């Protein structure tokens, strides 16, 4: 879920204390297990929510969303390439640069040589694998 993904990233970053707990999201309850993670992710620009007032913590994440969160966690670096090996993404997709970056960093090779499957649900196992590969590079 989006809450789990935020928590995974927050923990991978060392559980930094957010500057505050004031969020625009009405669906992140004070004291919830994911509140600090979402606050941190929001402050870092990793997520802006699904609307101005909702985070949608129980919504599943897609592969496109997960690599975008991870890419933003790294400061949204420009990928080295501008051409994707994946035929199922367009350069106008919000996750385009994130998917290029993740592929270049060996975080993901896609679901085949030519498919990234950006709209496929990203499982907990896949999220942890992406994080493991990302952290192995550091």
Task: Identify the meaning behind each predicted range.
Residues 2-36, 47-64, 72-97, 109-124, ...:
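Feature responds to low-complexity, polar/acidic, surface-exposed segments characteristic
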